[in-house]
């Protein structure tokens, strides 16, 4: 048991590092994108990325998850048949869909973009999509075989190549969106080439139609949930382009990318580490007490990071896009989008209650409903309110998700959350932001320092208002006493391997 837990932790950590590198490329390249691309170019890039993700999700048929579900280490020969069958089916479906699209690519360029002048982008898009479908299946096979180091090698190789070719095509060759997509094509194709030897050792040339039918029956319903989640997060891109233009979409996408730091570094990292623990302990006597504390602490972290991102968003956007003032308006969207991410984190925790009681159909209903709600609200308010309306819609829909999940979770897995503390976090965070927004509006060194003082003072403000419990203050004191000595850093890191009993320790 302990060996399995250690193995799981090891692979999870390695996968986290690999996945994080793929998220970083867009952030690292932001200064180049904003200096070399117009807002319209950046809008086109965001539009094509969204389109690509939707099509890849549909063509994948949920089979990357199906591979992990149906392949077992008990019968490796059968696993090889399944893997060959899945790859063959994925290639066939991709060709069946993409060949007609390629034939009618001129018409597609009129539908998606601005006609023949963007035909090269459509061509690149139609080549990238099947490569990404194959890559997603390949990475699932690597995870199945627990080759985590090879997984990271491929992901980091892709990241490095994409980064270098982006710089080459954009800075050296003066290319724009076409250069970015060409970089993606080269890096995706390279990953496939690097993984051919591995795949050849994990396949046998035997097609298994009966197993394929079972896998599709299992995996296909997952598509609707995934598409609904994507529609909730991304459908506003299409509506902004339809009602306004690519230029406004570019400004909006920069705001989304910047606020998305919270999702990448806090929410996704938390999900990766928390989920195995939650499923392991949810039936234990003190589990609910643990979960309520986690809700409070996650909300604290989300509000602190959202406040930090919001307070310094104006300075950061101006710094990143200093050569292109057309992007600067993006900072106005960031506080609302950050608040949406706070509720995204909260609704995630609340939604887990449906997993504990095996009522996951409720999750599917909530996601589909909120995706439809987001689309409906955007259709109504984007035209009069512009991109700020899209940001408001995103925030509101995550808030609605949290409310719905709260009522369902209280019905099936009741917990007494610390709402007084959570409300205090929201009120203090919002008031500090409003003070900064209206009093420290100008961008100068003095205001920057005052904002920094506000952030440093925030934990102290919470202390004055009685947010912390006695045991928490004691733990903070112990933590500081232990970690302030740099010489003990290695021992302290090793000591983080806490027992399950520590996680569930009474907070009274």
In which residue ranges do the predicted regions lie?
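Interfacial segments at transmembrane-helix termini and the short loops linking adjacent helices
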Residues: 5, 105-125, 310-340
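Interhelical loop/hinge segments that connect adjacent transmembrane helices in multipass membrane
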Residues: 1-4, 8, 177-178, 193-233, ...
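Membrane-proximal transmembrane or re-entrant/amphipathic helices at the cytosolic face
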Residues: 2, 439-508
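Helix-terminus/linker motif at the lipid-water interface of multi-pass membrane proteins
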Residues: 27-41, 109-112, 230-261, 265, ...
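Signature of the first transmembrane helix
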Residues: 7-65, 93-102, 128, 159-163, ...
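Hydrophobic alpha-helical transmembrane segments
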Residues: 119, 123, 152-200, 218, ...
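Helix-loop junctions and terminal segments of transmembrane helices
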Residues: 60-75, 144, 255, 259-296, ...
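Membrane-interface junctions at transmembrane-helix termini in multi-pass inner-membrane proteins
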Residues: 70, 131-154, 178, 199, ...
């Amino acid at each position: 048991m302990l060996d399995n837990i250690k193995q799981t932790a090891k692979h999870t950590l390695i996968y986290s590092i690999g996945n994080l590198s793929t998220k970083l490329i867009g952030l690292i390249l932001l200064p180049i994108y904003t200096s070399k691309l117009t807002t319209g170019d950046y809008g086109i890039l965001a539009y094509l990325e969204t389109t690509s993700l939707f099509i890849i999700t549909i063509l994948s048929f949920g089979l990357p998850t199906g591979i992990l579900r149906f392949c077992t280490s008990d019968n490796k020969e059968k696993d090889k048949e399944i893997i060959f069958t899945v790859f063959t089916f994925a290639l066939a479906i991709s060709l069946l869909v993409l060949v007609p699209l390629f034939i009618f690519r001129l018409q597609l360029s009129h539908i998606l973009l601005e006609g023949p002048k963007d035909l090269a982008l459509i061509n690149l898009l139609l080549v990238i999509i099947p490569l990404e479908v194959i890559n997603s299946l390949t990475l699932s096979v690597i995870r199945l075989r627990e080759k985590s180091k090879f997984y990271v090698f491929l992901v980091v190789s892709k990241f490095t190549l994409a980064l270098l070719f982006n710089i080459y095509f954009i800075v050296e060759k003066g290319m724009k969106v076409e250069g970015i997509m060409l970089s993606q094509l080269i890096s995706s194709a390279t990953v496939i080439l690097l993984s051919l030897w591995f795949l050849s050792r994990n396949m046998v040339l035997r097609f298994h139609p009966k197993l394929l039918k079972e896998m599709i029956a299992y995996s296909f319903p997952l598509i609707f949930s995934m598409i609904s989640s994507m529609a909730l997060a991304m459908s506003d891109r299409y509506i902004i382009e339809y009602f306004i233009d690519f230029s406004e979409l570019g400004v909006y996408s920069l705001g989304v990318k910047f606020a998305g730091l919270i999702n990448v570094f806090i929410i996704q990292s938390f999900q990766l580490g928390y989920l195995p623990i939650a499923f392991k302990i949810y039936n234990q006597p003190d589990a609910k007490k643990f979960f309520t504390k986690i809700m409070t602490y996650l909300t604290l972290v989300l509000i602190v990071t959202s406040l930090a991102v919001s307070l310094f968003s104006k300075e950061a956007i101006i710094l990143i896009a200093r050569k292109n003032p057309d992007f600067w308006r993006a900072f106005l969207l960031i506080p609302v989008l950050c608040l949406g991410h706070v509720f995204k984190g909260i609704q995630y925790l609340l939604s887990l209650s449906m997993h504990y009681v095996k009522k996951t159909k409720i999750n599917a209903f909530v996601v589909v409903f909120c995706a439809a709600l987001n689309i409906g609200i955007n259709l109504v308010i984007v035209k009069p309110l512009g991109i700020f309306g899209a940001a408001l819609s995103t925030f509101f829909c995550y808030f609605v998700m949290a409310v719905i999940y709260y009522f369902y979770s209280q019905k099936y897995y009741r917990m007494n959350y610390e709402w007084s503390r959570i409300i205090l976090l929201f009120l203090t965070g919002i008031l500090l932001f409003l003070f900064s927004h209206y009093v420290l509006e100008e961008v100068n060194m003095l205001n920057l320092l005052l904002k920094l003082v506000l952030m440093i003072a925030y934990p102290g403000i919470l202390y004055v208002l009685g947010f912390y419990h006695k045991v928490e203050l004691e733990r903070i004191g112990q933590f500081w006493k232990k970690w302030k000595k740099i010489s003990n850093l290695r021992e302290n890191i090793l000591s983080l391997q806490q027992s399950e009993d520590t996680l569930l320790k009474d907070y009274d």
